[in-house]
Amino acid sequence: MRTHNLGFPRIGAGRELKKAVEGYWKGRVSRHALEGEAARLRACHWAMQRDAGIDVVPVGDFALYDHMLDLTLMLGAIPPRFSPSGAAASPAGTGQDIDLMFRMARGEAGLSPVAPLEMTKWFDTNYHYLVPELDADTAFAPDASPLVAQLREAQDAGFTPKAVLPGPLTWLWLARSVDGSDRFALLPALCDAYATLLRELTSACPPACPRGYSSGGLMVQLDEPVLALDLPQTVRDLFPAVYTRLRAAVPDATLMVASYFAPCADNLPVALNLPVDVLHLDLVRGRDDLDAALQVLGAGEGTPGLALSLGVVDGRNVWCADIDAAVNLVRRAADSLGEDRVWVAPSCSLLHCPVDLGSERELDPEVARWLAFARQKCAEVRLVAEVVRGVYGPSTAASLEANREVRRQRAVSPRIHDPAVASRLAAVTSDMEHRTSPYAERIVAQRAALHLPTLPTTTIGSFPQTPDIRAARRALRDGSLTQDAYEAAMRDALAMMVREQEALGLDVLVHGEPERNDMVEYFGGLLQGFCITSDGWVQSYGTRCVKPPLLYGDVSRPEPMTVAWSAYARSLTARPMKAMLTGPVTIACWSFVRDDISRETVLRQLALALRDEVADLESAGLAVVQVDEPALREGLPLRRAAQEAYLDAAVRAFRLATSGVADATQLHTHMCYCDFHDIIDRIAGMDADVISLEASRSRMELLDVFATHGYPNEVGPGVYDIHSPRVPSVDEMEALLLRAAAVLPVDRLWVNPDCGLKTREWPETRAALANMVEAARRVRARLDA
């Protein structure tokens, strides 16, 4: 029995990677220094895993921006616009072209601007990947040299590595056809490209993982989380031929297919018969897969000698594992198959967890005992394996007993349960989940109150967090700035943001959120039942890192959280001022949520706390209140069987939070990049007066679903991408607005950026918003002509 890990956080315990990459972008860090810091982090992370008890460490999970983008580059699937010549670029033989990589990720400004690749959520997580673009003429130019170099780094340093790549069917499933062609028509060529990559890996790296199954060569982990989806039979049927082709290309390699995030369920028979050596199953989110797999393999069916990797430590949450429960699962497999056919692992890549609990110095000691970050999860994997083996010393016995005691203490802690919250939940009635009047009546009252033009302009909420704002926040934390002085600095920043918006000519203003470090962490610091880490960072996309709060107990609102800031902003302008809150679903999705009660109960607790805040904002004179739910779609379970219950709980929680206001108060919500086709009826059921959406990278394609389904309320499709520093032209945004106006009634359209502007700089923000306002003016004039 061996231990391994599917992936490790790449950002560094102190966000060293973020700082190095952003320094490179700004010209303060050389390429040599950037590559040196990346190599140092890789070595540090491999050592952390090995020292915690991981036998085989992942290589290829590290990326300067995104692992899907790295694979796209290794495949040579470069869209023509990223090549100076206009022809498809090929990095073959040159190693990783990091400037090309960053251009694909961020786009390029200048005289010949280039739009970046589209970005969207990685399955149901808060990680974002860059979507490969394909067309009928896409040709592959495979080059594994970047990954070969990393494997050699690991081997030279004495680690036992396994190469990690997204699998071919997952990569193709997640790609986007830009010309309407069938992307699966490229599968034969893609298989050839993968075969070339695998041959390059195995020929360049000596055997590193002998283990007596069917081969003893380099171990390669091919991630196929699409096996956790409700796949069409046509796609499911592709797996055997694809993996037969890959096995033939590298007969001596140790191939592992890894599925995670949900049960394999009806895809399990296909997975168990693939010509590979190891199959990884997520037993945290798909526990029933183990019984089904053991039944098949125990009957002598499936791939002969197939080993199972059992993901028994939760790779997506931070609570200590139930070691006894994990041991029972692994022991059942070992008893059925033999220990030599069982691997122990986290459920998925630890990319979604903070790096090291040891970095926390100020965390509440009681809550800290309940936690395990990535480094500690590797130790939990080792502990499970040692207990199952049954031969261990006093240290392992002590660790096992400590785990049991922590779980006992957490279950009875008075920090967890608040009787007042339970009583209030019990008093909720169904009428609290519905607005007083239907939208058709509300919009009349709102238009009379707000006096807005056709195509009103606004922003999503946040404005650039300048060095002065960040410095003030740091000074408050370290005690060198008093609370009064900090609040004065934030009021000054807020007033400046209001003046900027008035000068730009925006119709509905926001206060800009200078006081907020993060849209979820901020509220986690003010709600009872949460605690905040100092270094619990996880990667959201590229260099964007977030610090999810820890939701450990019953949730309530001790006092108003945002009212003073929004009310002050309202006092500075005669224009409508929009208040911003983060919705219950997003707070839950972007926090590390307790695992001892149902998610529905957590959502309703959050909704009641936010309901109080919405009511106080309305009482303070805020006529527009936005409750953001960018995570609603990403939280959707991957399997259809679980989706209805989730959506019902999510929509009811949103309505519970927002339905206590008068007809004239306009409720907005905001959502990020996602596929709305399968949930559009539920989005309509949220009954927000206005929904703003990320739409620019998809060229307004997502509006088609709103038109097809007759979405009844108002929509603000984003007209420019805030994830790139590029400033789009007036013509570009005008074209997008005209496209939107051709799909939806113009009297129900708003004009806004894709998302908040927190991560941008002021010069590009001013320029882009000025162009946006001018684009709206032009379209109004054209429509009035």
UniProtKB/Swiss-Prot annotation:
Q: Which Enzyme Commission number(s) are on file for it?
A: 2.1.1.14
Q: Which residues bind Zn(2+)?
A: H670, C672, E694, C755
- Gene symbol here is metE
Q: In which pathway does it act?
A: Amino-acid biosynthesis; L-methionine biosynthesis via de novo pathway; L-methionine from L-homocysteine (MetE route): step 1/1
> What is catalyzed by this enzyme?
5-methyltetrahydropteroyltri-L-glutamate + L-homocysteine = tetrahydropteroyltri-L-glutamate + L-methionine
Residue numbers binding 5-methyltetrahydropteroyltri-L-glutamate? R15, E16, L17, K18, K121, R544, C545, W590, E634
Family named by the database record? Belongs to the vitamin-B12 independent methionine synthase family.
Q: What residues does L-homocysteine bind to? A: I460, G461, S462, E513, D628
Q: Which residues cross the membrane?
A: none
Its needed co-factors are: Zn(2+)
Any GO MF annotation of the entry: zinc ion binding
Q: Does the keyword Methyltransferase apply?
A: yes
Name the record gives this protein: 5-methyltetrahydropteroyltriglutamate--homocysteine methyltransferase
Q: What does this protein do?
A: Catalyzes the transfer of a methyl group from 5-methyltetrahydrofolate to homocysteine resulting in methionine formation.
Q: Where does L-methionine bind?
A: I460, G461, S462, E513, D628
Q: Which organism is it from?
A: Nitratidesulfovibrio vulgaris (strain ATCC 29579 / DSM 644 / CCUG 34227 / NCIMB 8303 / VKM B-1760 / Hildenborough)
Output the GO biological process annotations, alphabetical, semicolon-separated. methionine biosynthetic process; methylation
Positions annotated as active site in the UniProt record: H723 (proton donor)
* UniProt keywords, alphabetically: Amino-acid biosynthesis, Metal-binding, Methionine biosynthesis, Methyltransferase, Repeat, Transferase, Zinc
State how the cofactor is bound.
Answer: Binds 1 zinc ion per subunit.
Q: Pfam families, from UniProt?
A: Meth_synt_1 (PF08267), Meth_synt_2 (PF01717)
* UniProt key word Zinc: yes
